[in-house]
UniProtKB/Swiss-Prot annotation:
The lineage of its organism: Bacteria, Bacillati, Bacillota, Bacilli, Lactobacillales. It comes from Streptococcus agalactiae serotype III (strain NEM316). Belongs to the FKBP-type PPIase family. Tig subfamily. Residues 163-248 form the PPIase FKBP-type domain. The gene is tig. This is Trigger factor. One of its GO terms (cellular component) is cytoplasm. It is found in: Cytoplasm. Consists of 3 domains; the N-terminus binds the ribosome, the middle domain has PPIase activity, while the C-terminus has intrinsic chaperone activity on its own. PROSITE patterns: FKBP_PPIASE. It catalyses: [protein]-peptidylproline (omega=180) = [protein]-peptidylproline (omega=0). Keywords: Cell cycle, Cell division, Chaperone, Cytoplasm, Isomerase, Rotamase.
Amino acid sequence: MSTSFENKATNRGIITFTISQDEIKPALDQAFNKVKKDLNVPGFRKGHMPRTVFNQKFGEEALYENALNLVLPKAYEAAVAELGLDVVAQPKIDVVSMEKGQDWKLTAEVVTKPEVKLGDYKDLSVEVDASKEVSAEEVDAKVERERNNLAELTVKDGEAAQGDTVVIDFVGSVDGVEFDGGKGDNFSLELGSGQFIPGFEEQLVGSKAGQTVDVNVTFPEDYQAEDLAGKDAKFVTTIHEVKTKEVPALDDELAKDIDDEVETLDELKAKYRKELESAKEIAFDDAVEGAAIELAVANAEIVELPEEMVHDEVHRAMNEFMGNMQRQGISPEMYFQLTGTTEEDLHKQYQADADKRVKTNLVIEAIAAAEGFEATDEEIEKEITDLASEYNMEADQVRGLLSADMLKHDIAMKKAVDVITSSATVK
């Protein structure tokens, strides 16, 4: 193979490479065997036309496109490897020449990984908005949340107050015309929960069972149903019942109802304190890691980030997100319907910080390379085992989904992150 690389601009260039006859001939044979299956030519049974007859009738050139598709991926990868390039986006391939009996000549317009000039990434001093300390108020708040979860709703006489639940029928209209989705029967609405659009729930405070209230509201400008956004609406609302929460007493019996592993309220609080301390420890470590990585990235210099890398990152993140949704049984169509968003909205969401994610990955990769981090066989096996456990899969399934190179890359990246964070100190 003959290869060359011509630099055209920062992180951009053109590879010129050839595909030899030794590679072309077997590819032409494969292409012919594939094509002839569908050929129906008088004088021959379907799929049994001789190669010589095919060449006479159609010309060998008729096989070139199929043959090129067979040999191109391997030839391109070999050219990139021979030149020692780190290509980061799909190439634009052009054919220079494909003549019978001659090596084929092609060019590939490529984008290469930008140069990263590392700054300080060890012994960094960072500030974090997080604490490991757990206050008595935080413990009490957790107990109170669990206590409220055990609250029972009972029907009450009198006016509905904030926090009460009202059982209602409602019919919505705009300019006197009812609209789709604006009607409900026997709907339980907790006042102050924010379930309905702003202004709705507040107008039911003070209402009583048996009353009908005209609730006048304005739909938000960014409301998901565009035909209603920004419009004034009236909901004729009938209150059937008003219910209030009755929470159990704050005592040892409550503690046992919440957690059958404790006997007293003090034991429950002690258990919650440990849980909160553990969660805060993790959150604190995550905050330190995030701040240290952000500072290491800020200290580095990246020469012109290719837009193709950002584009690919947006689509990678979107595909990963939608894949997670589908594993939960939620199709893209269902997700967009439930959230009132579009694919374009999701694209904008991931576009917002795609630059930052790409730069972060580039800097961490550069640190891994600078430190000479590599993955051992034992580390690869442990990574496979950990992933299998995390996603409830068999180890062989993980091996089938992730190549050894991907696993090695991920392990090296984790080591680089550890170098950054383990030496960082908090101001």
